[in-house]
Amino acid sequence: MELAAYLEQLEGGVFKLLPLWEDQDNGQDVHLDLYIQDLLDEMIGAQETFPSLAGNGHYIKVVNTVQYMAKHECSRSAWKRRVFGMMSTLNRMRGYCRDV
């Protein structure tokens, strides 16, 4: 898999955090904690598939943000801000891949 394709797929996975959080906030059992853990496992594993990610500050920031969200409660506005911030970062990273 090409790095740009992975980052695009990951951006979609990060976006999915929004409806899952909203469904959970509305009382549905969506297993958000399991989804976040699976997402983190994938992101950490990707650092072996794409070694350049391991030293990329933007990528590490996204991983750290997901880890924070896994352990701490957030307001709706904070959750949305974090998700859209991560999506923006991943989108910029994809742009860098195309420019190379």
Label each region the model flagged:
Residues 16-65:
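Amphipathic alpha-helical interaction modules
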Residues 4-5, 46, 54, 70, ...:
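A sequence-composition feature that detects small, non-aromatic residues
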Residues 63-100:
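Amphipathic alpha-helical binding modules
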Residues 1-33, 87-92:
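Short terminal alpha-helical segments
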Residues 1, 36, 96-100:
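Short intrinsically disordered terminal tails
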